[in-house]
Design a protein with these regions (language model features):
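N-terminal cationic-hydrophobic initiation segments that often serve targeting/anchoring roles
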Residues: 37, 73-77, 98, 145, ...
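Short, flexible loop segments at the rims of nucleotide/cofactor-binding pockets, characterized by
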Residues: 61-62, 127-133
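A donor-sugar binding/catalytic signature common to diverse glycosyltransferases
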Residues: 137-180
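Hydrophobic beta-strand segments of well-ordered beta-sheets in folded domains
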Residues: 42-45, 82-84, 105-106, 148-151, ...
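Catalytic donor nucleotide-activated moiety binding site of glycosyltransferases and closely related
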Residues: 48-53, 79-130
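Secretory-pathway luminal glycosyltransferase catalytic domains
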Residues: 1-81
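A short acidic (Asp/Glu
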Residues: 57-60, 94-100, 162-165
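Glycosyltransferase-associated regions of secretory-pathway enzymes
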Residues: 59, 121-126, 177-182
Length: 182
Protein backbone atom coordinates (compact mmCIF):
# COMPACT_ATOMS: atom_id res chain seq x y z
CA UNK A 1 0.00 0.00 0.00
CA UNK A 2 2.81 2.46 0.83
CA UNK A 3 4.23 2.33 -2.69
CA UNK A 4 0.87 3.10 -4.24
CA UNK A 5 0.54 6.26 -2.14
CA UNK A 6 3.73 7.61 -3.72
CA UNK A 7 2.52 6.89 -7.25
CA UNK A 8 0.89 9.94 -8.87
CA UNK A 9 -1.07 7.83 -11.36
CA UNK A 10 -2.58 5.82 -8.50
CA UNK A 11 -3.31 8.97 -6.47
CA UNK A 12 -4.82 10.67 -9.54
CA UNK A 13 -7.08 7.64 -10.09
CA UNK A 14 -8.18 7.57 -6.44
CA UNK A 15 -8.77 11.32 -6.34
CA UNK A 16 -10.86 11.19 -9.52
CA UNK A 17 -12.81 8.24 -8.16
CA UNK A 18 -13.56 9.46 -4.63
CA UNK A 19 -13.30 13.23 -4.44
CA UNK A 20 -15.94 15.07 -6.43
CA UNK A 21 -16.83 18.74 -6.32
CA UNK A 22 -20.56 19.41 -6.35
CA UNK A 23 -22.08 21.48 -9.17
CA UNK A 24 -22.38 24.62 -7.05
CA UNK A 25 -18.69 24.47 -6.08
CA UNK A 26 -17.65 23.87 -9.69
CA UNK A 27 -19.75 26.88 -10.78
CA UNK A 28 -18.10 29.07 -8.13
CA UNK A 29 -14.61 27.92 -9.14
CA UNK A 30 -15.38 28.33 -12.83
CA UNK A 31 -16.79 31.81 -12.22
CA UNK A 32 -13.66 32.82 -10.31
CA UNK A 33 -11.52 31.39 -13.11
CA UNK A 34 -13.50 33.29 -15.77
CA UNK A 35 -12.95 36.56 -13.87
CA UNK A 36 -9.16 36.29 -14.23
CA UNK A 37 -8.82 34.52 -17.60
CA UNK A 38 -10.58 36.29 -20.46
CA UNK A 39 -9.83 33.60 -23.06
CA UNK A 40 -10.63 30.05 -22.01
CA UNK A 41 -8.07 28.81 -24.57
CA UNK A 42 -5.21 30.63 -22.83
CA UNK A 43 -2.31 28.38 -21.92
CA UNK A 44 -1.32 28.88 -18.29
CA UNK A 45 1.86 28.12 -16.42
CA UNK A 46 1.04 27.67 -12.74
CA UNK A 47 3.54 28.81 -10.13
CA UNK A 48 2.78 27.91 -6.53
CA UNK A 49 4.84 28.95 -3.52
CA UNK A 50 3.52 29.02 0.01
CA UNK A 51 4.39 31.71 2.48
CA UNK A 52 7.03 31.35 5.13
CA UNK A 53 4.67 31.26 8.10
CA UNK A 54 5.61 27.70 9.03
CA UNK A 55 9.04 28.53 10.41
CA UNK A 56 8.36 26.76 13.69
CA UNK A 57 6.42 23.80 12.33
CA UNK A 58 8.97 21.80 10.29
CA UNK A 59 7.19 22.28 6.97
CA UNK A 60 9.19 22.00 3.74
CA UNK A 61 11.38 25.01 3.04
CA UNK A 62 10.36 26.71 -0.18
CA UNK A 63 12.91 27.18 -2.98
CA UNK A 64 14.43 30.57 -3.66
CA UNK A 65 12.18 32.63 -5.90
CA UNK A 66 15.00 33.06 -8.44
CA UNK A 67 15.11 29.27 -8.93
CA UNK A 68 11.37 29.10 -9.53
CA UNK A 69 11.36 32.12 -11.85
CA UNK A 70 14.21 30.74 -13.96
CA UNK A 71 12.38 27.44 -14.44
CA UNK A 72 9.05 29.19 -15.09
CA UNK A 73 10.53 31.47 -17.75
CA UNK A 74 12.16 28.50 -19.48
CA UNK A 75 8.95 26.47 -19.73
CA UNK A 76 6.76 29.49 -20.44
CA UNK A 77 8.76 30.03 -23.63
CA UNK A 78 9.35 26.35 -24.44
CA UNK A 79 5.67 25.41 -24.20
CA UNK A 80 4.28 28.69 -25.61
CA UNK A 81 2.28 29.71 -22.55
CA UNK A 82 0.17 32.86 -22.46
CA UNK A 83 0.11 33.66 -18.73
CA UNK A 84 1.78 32.90 -15.44
CA UNK A 85 -0.82 31.97 -12.84
CA UNK A 86 0.71 32.87 -9.47
CA UNK A 87 -0.71 31.01 -6.47
CA UNK A 88 0.56 32.34 -3.16
CA UNK A 89 -1.08 33.93 -0.17
CA UNK A 90 2.08 35.85 0.68
CA UNK A 91 2.08 39.50 -0.42
CA UNK A 92 5.90 39.76 -0.42
CA UNK A 93 6.19 36.72 -2.71
CA UNK A 94 3.63 38.14 -5.12
CA UNK A 95 5.53 41.44 -5.28
CA UNK A 96 8.77 39.52 -5.93
CA UNK A 97 7.18 37.67 -8.84
CA UNK A 98 6.04 41.02 -10.24
CA UNK A 99 9.67 42.19 -10.21
CA UNK A 100 10.91 39.17 -12.18
CA UNK A 101 8.04 38.48 -14.58
CA UNK A 102 6.18 40.77 -17.00
CA UNK A 103 3.17 42.14 -15.09
CA UNK A 104 0.92 41.93 -18.14
CA UNK A 105 1.57 38.16 -18.23
CA UNK A 106 0.74 37.55 -14.54
CA UNK A 107 -2.72 36.51 -13.41
CA UNK A 108 -3.75 35.67 -9.86
CA UNK A 109 -6.72 34.71 -7.77
CA UNK A 110 -6.55 36.22 -4.28
CA UNK A 111 -2.75 36.06 -4.38
CA UNK A 112 -0.88 38.17 -1.92
CA UNK A 113 -3.88 38.64 0.32
CA UNK A 114 -1.79 38.28 3.49
CA UNK A 115 0.64 41.12 4.17
CA UNK A 116 1.60 40.60 7.78
CA UNK A 117 1.16 37.53 9.86
CA UNK A 118 1.65 36.72 13.47
CA UNK A 119 1.34 32.94 13.50
CA UNK A 120 -0.02 30.78 10.71
CA UNK A 121 -1.26 32.33 7.47
CA UNK A 122 -4.25 29.99 7.46
CA UNK A 123 -5.32 31.31 10.85
CA UNK A 124 -5.01 34.88 9.56
CA UNK A 125 -7.12 34.08 6.50
CA UNK A 126 -9.82 32.50 8.67
CA UNK A 127 -9.95 35.67 10.79
CA UNK A 128 -10.83 37.66 7.68
CA UNK A 129 -13.21 35.13 6.08
CA UNK A 130 -15.65 32.44 7.02
CA UNK A 131 -14.38 28.87 6.94
CA UNK A 132 -16.59 28.24 3.89
CA UNK A 133 -15.20 31.22 1.97
CA UNK A 134 -11.62 30.28 2.88
CA UNK A 135 -12.25 26.71 1.70
CA UNK A 136 -13.80 27.92 -1.57
CA UNK A 137 -10.80 30.17 -2.17
CA UNK A 138 -8.45 27.22 -1.62
CA UNK A 139 -10.52 24.99 -3.93
CA UNK A 140 -10.53 27.76 -6.54
CA UNK A 141 -6.74 27.98 -6.33
CA UNK A 142 -6.45 24.21 -6.89
CA UNK A 143 -9.08 24.37 -9.64
CA UNK A 144 -7.13 27.04 -11.51
CA UNK A 145 -3.82 25.23 -10.98
CA UNK A 146 -5.50 22.26 -12.66
CA UNK A 147 -6.42 24.45 -15.63
CA UNK A 148 -2.70 25.12 -16.12
CA UNK A 149 -0.58 23.18 -18.61
CA UNK A 150 2.53 23.46 -16.45
CA UNK A 151 3.01 23.38 -12.67
CA UNK A 152 6.17 24.65 -10.99
CA UNK A 153 6.50 25.36 -7.31
CA UNK A 154 7.78 24.49 -3.91
CA UNK A 155 6.77 21.39 -2.01
CA UNK A 156 3.55 22.14 -0.17
CA UNK A 157 0.08 20.66 0.09
CA UNK A 158 -1.31 22.72 -2.84
CA UNK A 159 1.37 21.64 -5.34
CA UNK A 160 1.19 18.01 -4.27
CA UNK A 161 -2.62 17.84 -4.47
CA UNK A 162 -2.67 19.79 -7.74
CA UNK A 163 -0.13 17.40 -9.26
CA UNK A 164 -2.23 14.30 -8.73
CA UNK A 165 -5.62 15.93 -9.07
CA UNK A 166 -4.90 17.08 -12.64
CA UNK A 167 -6.35 14.65 -15.13
CA UNK A 168 -4.94 14.48 -17.76
CA UNK A 169 -1.53 15.21 -16.23
CA UNK A 170 0.44 18.41 -16.80
CA UNK A 171 2.70 18.80 -19.83
CA UNK A 172 5.46 19.54 -17.33
CA UNK A 173 5.52 19.50 -13.55
CA UNK A 174 8.32 20.28 -11.13
CA UNK A 175 7.65 20.35 -7.42
CA UNK A 176 10.94 21.60 -6.06
CA UNK A 177 11.89 19.83 -2.86
CA UNK A 178 14.77 21.56 -1.08
CA UNK A 179 15.04 18.56 1.28
CA UNK A 180 15.05 21.05 4.15
CA UNK A 181 12.36 22.05 6.58
CA UNK A 182 11.80 25.11 8.68
Amino acid sequence: MGRKCNNNDYLREQYSKYIKLNKNTINICEGNYARIVSDNNSKLLGVCLRGTDYLLYHHPMQPQIEVVVKEAKKYFKLLNCDYYYIATEDYALLKSFEKYLPKEKIITYNAGNVRQVDGLIGEQIRKDKSATDAALDYLTTLYILNKCSVLIGGKCRATIVASYRKNPPYEYVNIIDTHKSY
